[in-house]
C-alpha cells in the first residue's frame, strides 16, 4: 500500500511514477475525494465540539434551574447532523482506502521502462549451455524413462496440471528441497520455518494478493472480511505466511535483519494462462518452492536485494545449471515490487532460458498494509520496515533443469555432486 501522505500531497508525482508501470491513476477522482474528505473531517470535528459544548451547557442550565428542553433539542439535532457527516466520512474513507489497495508499488528509479518481458534487461550470465552429441530429451521423456513422472495418474486423481512422482525422481525432488534448505540455513543465515498451508483474509491482504488477485487463489469459501474462520485460502507462495509473521508487530532494531526460509507446496489457479506450458512440470496448480524472506531497515533494502539474489544464484551454481540474471522492467514487475531480479535457467529441450527464481524488494508496501514496524535505538517512534522475498528456488522447475541439463545419451541422469549425499551416494538415476 502506498503512503497516504503521498496520495494527498504529491498526487501528480505519484501518477507520473505509476504511469511508468502503465497504470493510470485517477487523479481527478482522488483529488475530488480528498477535498470532500477534508470538508467532512472539519465538519465532524466542529459538530463534535459544538455538541460537547451544548451538552455541558445543559448541566450548567440545569443547576441554575433553567429550562433545558431547547438545549436538549439542539444537542439531538447536532447529534443527527454529526452521525450523518460521520457516515458519509466513513464511506468516503473506505472508498479511498479500497482504491489505495488497488494501486501497485512505485518502481525504483533504477528500474527500466518497458511493457513486458521483452523489455527486461539482462544483467549477467553464468555457465555455458552444454553442447550435446545426441538427441536432447525433455524432462517429460526423461521422467518416463526413469519411471518417476506420471501425469496420467495425476489426471485420474485430480485433473490437469498436477503430477505424481515416484521412486528415484521423487527422491531427487526431495533431495533438491533438502539441499536448498541446508544451504540457506547453514551458509546464508536464514532461519527455517514450518508454516500453515492455509491462510486467512488478513494475511492475503497483508502481502498484496487481495483484493486484486482473488481469482489466482484456491479458497475454501469466498474470502471477505465478514467470513467466519473457515474461510481460508491455500497459499500461492510461502511469502504470504512468512511475511505475515511480522504483521502488527514492532521489532527492536537490534533484531534486524530477519532472514526466514520455508519449504512449502504452493497452489495457484493459473487464471489467464490457459494453453500455456501445458506439457510437463513448468506450470502446475501445485508445486513446491523454497522461499526466502528478509525484513530489514529501509536504508538496507537494496543491498539486501542484491544479497538475496546471490543466495538464489548460489543454488544454481552448485547444481551446475547455466542461468542468466535479468532486471525486470516496470511493465513486467509484480504488483507489490519496487525492483525485481529474475533468474532464468537454461532448458536444453526448449533451447531457451526460463524463470526459476524471482527476487523482489517490496520496500514498505507490505509493511504499511501489515503495520509491521521497528523501533530504532535513537528514535523511539516506530517506523515501517522494508520486506523482501525471493524463490530459493522453485523445486519443480529446478528438477526440470537438473534432468535436462545433466542427461546422458542413454536417458540416465548424472546426479550433481552436491545432491549425492541426499541420494545415498547415487551418481546416476534412470
Curated annotation (Swiss-Prot):
Assigned keywords, A-Z: Aminoacyl-tRNA synthetase, ATP-binding, Cytoplasm, Ligase, Nucleotide-binding, Protein biosynthesis
GO biological process: selenocysteine biosynthetic process; seryl-tRNA aminoacylation
Record GO cellular component, one term: cytoplasm
Statement: the UniProt record of this protein carries the keyword Protein biosynthesis: yes
Positions annotated to bind ATP: 268-270, 355-358
Region (Disordered): 103-127
Binding site for L-serine: 237-239, 291, 391
Primary site of residence: cytoplasm
EC identifiers of the protein: 6.1.1.11
HAMAP family (UniProt xref): Ser_tRNA_synth_type1
Free-text comment about domains: Consists of two distinct domains, a catalytic core and a N-terminal extension that is involved in tRNA binding.
PANTHER family named in the record: SERINE--TRNA LIGASE (PTHR43697:SF1), SERYL-TRNA SYNTHETASE (PTHR43697)
Role summary: Catalyzes the attachment of serine to tRNA(Ser). Is also able to aminoacylate tRNA(Sec) with serine, to form the misacylated tRNA L-seryl-tRNA(Sec), which will be further converted into selenocysteinyl-tRNA(Sec).
Subunit structure: Homodimer. The tRNA molecule binds across the dimer.
Protein name per Swiss-Prot or TrEMBL: Serine--tRNA ligase
